[in-house]
């Protein structure tokens, strides 16, 4: 691979000791993306065919709970960063190791708005 070739990736991120709450925020954040056919096709190609078929079925019957269930833990772990600081930092390093030269962390918070999420992210990497 060429060193001049740029690979960047936006990664939804939620830092919280309460992993379940952080995962819930990530599922809510990704609902809109999961509803779009272009993202569904991308994730199918990336190996998440069952998840995206389940998403499509949930969307077809407008079942929000089924949609949340369709976004599996495996899928969520692979496409976002969430949980305690150490896990988020470890996940960030994994993205770098995979060849993503510029991971773009897009923060959300379980307990506040965008500014709170940015503060949490800055503290995590201070």
Q: How should these model regions be labeled?
A:
Residues 1-126:
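Active-site-adjacent structural elements that line small-molecule/cofactor binding pockets in enzymes
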